[in-house]
């Protein structure tokens, strides 16, 4: 057969999703155009019978799913006949019968486009078109009395040929892209199945071993069972091996995902990394098959360097190279990974003494899906390595002596090179920055830089920031001005609670000439930035915060904090003994001296008998409440009448807060307050 049935079935399967639409268009369009060409724009020849036959054929495509099952198996052949009859044959026949009129020449060209779209196989389409046009000629000259004045209108032929040839070329390009995607999907599925079979088999074996160590439920006669030391060690060994198997399986999946996903080779997560740290971790975590393989890998560090890129991508690239090396190993096998520098580039050399690669294959090994002599391989590893190195601004090349050695050289641009700076500049355009503060000089500098470098910039005050939800801080860089955040004692703890959910880098802008009466959240990763540095070199500071986080010291101790004054005495007044005791312990741990009272009536007695620097008082107490006690203090004629008083209340309604202000209290804390809120509030007033 010129065209096999398998090819016809593939053509039908490709067109099947669009057949209902095409069928309805043909079933309705063929009769409708009879009236157009017969009455609206009359042509010299029309054939209603031929149009009805075409409409009936297209109707079969519309109702194909309603046909008996035994008929549906013939649908591929029926489809091919219908397309051949209704497109190239019908339009060629009508063009000849209308003596090559312009309207029918244009109609024939339109049918060519539809023919190319519906029959994706170029050979089938070309044979069908040629055969149908020949049959049309035979029908015109052999079955009708009409004979066209011109056998072939040669001026139309170049246009028809151009449409067929270039239409097929464009369609062929799209088809190749489609088949590549399908191939990638199949490869990915096959890779997952292959890579997971061994880990699952290992887990199954581990489960079987554990099952032999425990009694079966049917034979269990006791409620308690004991394990000896050997059995316990074996169980732990099995569990550890199971963890290793799961880790290896996850690595395999991640490697496959990054190998086939173009988006994963993206500079979005690029940062400054130490190549030695990355390679040491990769060599340590690579899923070796046995201890001998692990001992065969040697790392030589001649000149360490930093690179701009992704540590994860470089790790997976190295995994690919090691995986290939171990697959083609031979006796006395070894791998040497060396790190060195030249005058222009930084290099990683991965050299093994395996079987080597033939010279004629060296040019093909970086092509997608190319593989040779390797069962279970899908030709994704080395192309992935090339994509990674290209994204880093570098290259990868291979040299080999067949039967002796293979060496891959990964070349990186220097960290301070123009290549890396260009990558940073483009990457900076995708970043977003928010400044939380009221320093207009900083706002102007950052806004100007944002315009020049085209990154997103937002500026808000600390008061505005505390009203935002945590999801509204999805920025790559967050700069918090301590001058604004500490203007009121309670803002910083609230902001730190919200920022603890942020994934971006957080910088605290401080003035070295000031001291801050705050306790910075020890669990929050922050980078201190002096106000002078960000005003002098804003671009350098931002690039360091975005791209060099791991190499920054993050020494929060450079922020000048107000030293605790251990001689300060605080009076804690609360009728709840638990709260009073807890608060006293917390303050004493910070070096304060604490005096306790359980009612407002005792406040004046303590203040008359000793020096008190701050009163922390509950508002609602049974005998004399905090508001009344505050009024008594403010209305007295003693020196302590101006002592700072912080109210402690569980009611934060506007009415209660208004009473707090009118009573003479300096500040308030809403119950329940966490440790940082309490300490920051106290530090702000003593």
Curated annotation (Swiss-Prot):
The modification Phosphohistidine is found at residue 194. The modification 4-aspartylphosphate is found at residue 618. CDD domains: HisKA, REC_hyHK_CKI1_RcsC-like. GO terms for cellular component: plasma membrane. Residues 191-416 form the Histidine kinase domain. It is a multi-pass membrane protein. Its main location: membrane. InterPro entries: CheY-like_superfamily, HATPase_C_sf, His_kinase_dom, HisK_dim/P_dom, HisK_dim/P_sf, Sig_transdc_His_kin-like_C, Sig_transdc_resp-reg_receiver. It holds the Pfam family Response_reg. Signal peptide: none annotated. Residues 569-686 form the Response regulatory domain. It is found in: Cell membrane. The chain crosses the membrane at residues 21-41, 47-64, 77-97, 100-120, 124-144, 152-172. It catalyses: ATP + protein L-histidine = ADP + protein N-phospho-L-histidine. Gene3D superfamilies: 1.10.287.130, 3.40.50.2300, Histidine kinase-like ATPase, C-terminal domain. Its EC number is 2.7.13.3, 3.1.3.-. It comes from the Bacteria. One of its GO terms (molecular function) is ATP binding. SMART domains: HATPase_c (SM00387), REC (SM00448). Keywords: ATP-binding, Cell membrane, Hydrolase, Kinase, Membrane, Nucleotide-binding, Phosphoprotein, Protein phosphatase, Transferase, Transmembrane, Transmembrane helix. Senses the quorum-sensing autoinducer CAI-1 ((S)-3-hydroxytridecan-4-one) which probably functions as an intragenus signal. The sensory signal is then relayed to LuxU and LuxO. This is CAI-1 autoinducer sensor kinase/phosphatase CqsS. The gene is cqsS.
């Amino acid at each position: 057969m010129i065209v096999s049935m398998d090819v016809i079935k593939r053509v039908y399967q490709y067109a099947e999703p669009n057949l209902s639409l095409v069928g309805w268009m043909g079933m309705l369009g063929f009769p409708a155009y009879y009236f157009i060409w017969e009455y609206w724009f009359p042509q010299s020849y029309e054939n209603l019978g031929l149009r009805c036959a075409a409409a009936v054929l297209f109707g079969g495509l519309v109702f194909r799913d309603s046909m008996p099952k035994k008929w549906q198996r013939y649908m591929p052949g029926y489809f091919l006949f219908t397309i051949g009859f209704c497109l190239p044959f019908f339009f060629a026949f009508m063009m000849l019968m209308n003596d090559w009129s312009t309207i029918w020449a244009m109609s024939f060209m339109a049918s060519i486009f539809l023919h190319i779209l519906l029959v994706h196989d170029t050979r089938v389409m070309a044979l069908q078109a040629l055969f149908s046009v020949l049959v049309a000629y035979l029908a015109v000259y052999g079955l009708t009395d009409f004979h066209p004045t011109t056998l072939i209108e040669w001026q139309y032929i170049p246009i028809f040929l151009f449409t067929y040839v270039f239409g097929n070329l464009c369609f062929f390009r799209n088809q190749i892209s489609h088949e590549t995607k399908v191939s990638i999907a199949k490869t990915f599925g096959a890779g997952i199945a292959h890579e997971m079979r061994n880990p699952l088999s290992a887990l199954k074996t581990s489960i079987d071993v554990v099952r032999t160590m425990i009694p079966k439920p049917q034979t269990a006669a006791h409620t308690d069972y004991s394990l000896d030391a050997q059995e316990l060690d074996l169980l732990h060994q099995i569990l550890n091996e199971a963890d290793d198997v799961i880790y290896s399986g996850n690595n395999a999946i991640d490697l496959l995902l990054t190998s086939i996903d173009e988006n994963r080779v993206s500079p979005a997560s690029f940062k400054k990394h130490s190549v030695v740290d990355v390679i040491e971790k990769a060599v340590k975590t690579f899923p070796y098959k046995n201890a001998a393989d692990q001992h065969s890998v040697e790392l030589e560090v001649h000149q360490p360097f930093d690179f701009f890129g992704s540590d994860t991508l470089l790790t997976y690239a190295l995994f690919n190279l090691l995986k290939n090396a171990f697959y083609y190993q031979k006796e006395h096998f070894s791998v040497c990974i060396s790190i060195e520098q030249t005058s222009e580039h930084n290099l990683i050399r991965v050299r093994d003494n395996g079987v080597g690669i033939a010279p004629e294959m060296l040019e093909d090994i970086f092509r997608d899906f190319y593989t040779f002599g390797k069962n279970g391989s899908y030709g994704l590893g080395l192309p992935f390595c090339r994509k990674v190195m290209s994204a880093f601004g570098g290259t990868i090349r291979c040299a080999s002596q067949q039967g002796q050695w293979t060496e891959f050289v990964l070349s990186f641009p220097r960290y301070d090179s123009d290549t890396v700076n260009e990558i940073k500049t483009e990457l900076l355009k995708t970043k977003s920055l928010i400044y939380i503060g009221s320093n207009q000089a900083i706002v102007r500098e950052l806004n100007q830089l944002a315009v020049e470098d085209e990154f997103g910039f937002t500026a808000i005050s600390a008061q505005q920031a505390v009203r935002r939800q945590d999801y509204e801080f999805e920025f790559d860089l967050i700069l918090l001005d301590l001058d604004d955040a500490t203007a009121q004692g309670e803002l910083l703890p609230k902001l730190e609670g919200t920022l603890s959910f942020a994934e971006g880098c957080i910088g605290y802008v401080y003035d070295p000439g000031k001291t801050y009466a705050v306790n910075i959240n020890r669990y929050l990763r922050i980078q201190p930035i002096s106000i002078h540095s960000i005003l002098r070199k804003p671009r350098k500071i931002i690039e360091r915060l975005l791209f060099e986080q791991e190499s920054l010291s993050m020494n929060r101790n450079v922020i000048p904090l107000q030293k605790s004054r251990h001689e300060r005495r605080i009076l804690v007044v609360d009728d709840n003994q638990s709260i009073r005791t807890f608060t006293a312990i917390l303050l004493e741990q910070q070096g304060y001296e604490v005096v306790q009272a359980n009612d407002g009536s005792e406040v004046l007695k303590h203040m008359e008998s000793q020096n008190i620097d701050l009163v922390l008082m509950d508002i609602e107490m049974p005998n004399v409440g905090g508001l009344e006690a505050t009024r008594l203090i403010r209305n007295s004629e003693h020196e302590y009448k101006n002592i700072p008083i912080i109210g402690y209340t569980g009611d934060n309604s506007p009415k209660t807060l208004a009473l707090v202000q009118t009573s003479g209290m300096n500040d308030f804390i809403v119950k329940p307050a966490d440790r940082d809120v309490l300490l920051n509030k106290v530090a702000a007033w003593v």
